[in-house]
Structures are given as C-alpha cells and as structure tokens.
Amino acid sequence: IAAGCGSKRDGLTITNVSYDPTREFYEEYNKVFADYYMAEYGKQIKVIQSHGGSGSQARSVVEGCNADVVTLALEHDISLIENTGLIDAGWKDEYDKDSSPYTSTIVFLVRKGNPLNISDWDDLIKDGVEVITPDPKSSGGACWNFLAALSYARDKNNSEDKQKEFLGKLYANAVSYTHLT
C-alpha cells in the first residue's frame, strides 16, 4: 500500500519508507523511475530508501522520520500515519484497488518429491502435515498468508464457523512460526 506524506520540497531527493521485502524491488524500480523522471521533467531525482518491518516503519514516520512516500505492507500501518494528520484522510480512494500498488502470491514449498502430495489449502489441514509460516503478529507478509487462507476458506464455505474451523486446523498444524521482522 502506498501513500504520500510529508511536505512538498523543491529538491529532487525523496525518501521512500518501505518494508523489508521490497528492498530489492525498489532498488531496480528507482532506476526506472529516475529515467522516467529525467525524460518527463528533464531533471535528475534521487530516491533514498529506508526499509524495516512495516509496523516499525509506520511508527518511525509518526515519530518524525522524514518520509516523502510510504510503501508499507498493511493498511493499518498507513492508517496509523493518517491518524496523525501526516497523510490526508481518504488516501485509500485516490487510486485503483484501494491505493495498493502491488499484490502478493502465496507459494507452498514442500519436501523433495512432495511425499504428502500437497497441492492446495485443504492439504495443509490434513493430519500429519506440518506447516511452517510466519506469525501473523510479526510481519505484513505473515498477515498476507493469513488473509490468503481466510480468503480460501470464505470462497469454500459460507459458514463463518466452517471458516474458523479451517483456520484453526491450519494453524494447529503450524509446528513453527518464523519471525520475519
């Protein structure tokens, strides 16, 4: 989710405060953006990157980190900044798809040869399957994993109880939470 914040400046150096997994993406994207900016405006632009956990980055902006752009993992992280007045209310409505500039894909990694024949979400709730996933309380990406599982459960079951049952079984099979932040 992206949003502009901070004051406008005459300089051509901007700071993008973002979350960890976007570091390499923005290293490449900033080169393309600088070329575009030069072609469009005839001026050079430099983008300074700041990366960390999405929630930590949001708090750093609230506490005074000078961000021209924030590209954080979760809506509530940007809303935290909005609540301080650093971002105008209604930022979500400024662009398509709730101002989310990118999406994510969930991938299942399995043991060599896929001995448990895992191919879909339902396979992850079977007895004997061990799931390793980041703790949804620890990172934006982990929340995306949870939301992907919830979306699957909702598509499959109209019953909220069945959805909760699916999620309960999935996380009961989580033998380890990895912490990404």
Predicted regions and their residues:
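C-terminal motif of bacterial Sec signal peptides marking the signal peptidase cleavage site
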Residues: 3-4
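N-terminal segment of the mature folded domain
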Residues: 8-138
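Short helix-coil transition/hinge motifs at the ends and kinks of transmembrane helices
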Residues: 40-43, 156-161
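Internal, well-ordered alpha-helical segments in soluble enzyme and binding-protein domains
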Residues: 104, 117-120, 142-149, 166
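Short helix-loop capping/hinge motifs at secondary-structure junctions, enriched
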Residues: 113-119, 152-159
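Extracytoplasmic/periplasmic solute-binding protein
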Residues: 129-155
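Extracytoplasmic surface signature
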Residues: 161-174
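Conserved small/polar residues in nucleotide/adenosyl-binding loops
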Residues: 178-181
